[in-house]
């Protein structure tokens, strides 16, 4: 199962990449929303782990771009974000095609693997 992690926090992406690789996932990482979008457009992923709060080109920007190009419904996106993001925003995002779950940081690794396995 191949997974793309899009998060600007390199320590988080390194930790998640190592853990998921040990669990048998093939993992690619982008520390930038624009590069993440480019990878999504070029490759097929079983799931995309997407941080909402990134500088310059956020996870919300990436989702909006995928919606505009009618590509969101073809994705499996699991959001992960800081607790500062409101529940209303999370609820509205979870109603969009392609967005399957939202995990709050700090992400519990066992919950992440369980969520990935369920999608």
Give residue spans per PLM region.
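Short hydrophobic/Thr-rich beta-strand motif most characteristic of the beta2 strand and flanking loop
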Residues: 24-31, 39, 103
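Active-site residues of response regulator receiver
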Residues: 51
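Alpha4 helix (beta4-alpha4-beta5 surface) of REC/receiver domains from two-component response regulators
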Residues: 61, 84-102, 110, 114
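Receiver (REC) domain active-site loop signature in two-component systems and cognate sites
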Residues: 54
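Hydrophobic/aromatic residues positioned on beta-strands within the core alpha/beta folds
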Residues: 80-82
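Acidic catalytic/metal-coordinating carboxylates
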Residues: 31-35, 58-64
């Amino acid at each position: 199962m191949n997974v793309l992690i899009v998060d600007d926090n390199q320590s988080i992406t390194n930790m998640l990449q190592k853990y998921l690789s040990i669990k048998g996932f093939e993992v690619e990482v982008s520390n930038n929303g624009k590069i993440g979008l480019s990878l999504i457009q070029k490759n097929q992923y079983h799931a995309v782990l997407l941080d909402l709060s990134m500088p310059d080109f956020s996870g919300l920007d990436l989702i909006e771009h995928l919606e505009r190009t009618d590509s969101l419904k073809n994705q499996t996106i699991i959001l992960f974000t800081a607790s500062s993001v409101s529940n209303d925003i999370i609820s509205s995002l979870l109603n969009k095609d392609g967005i399957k779950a939202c995990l709050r940081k700090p992400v519990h690794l066992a919950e992440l693997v369980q969520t990935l396995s369920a999608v």
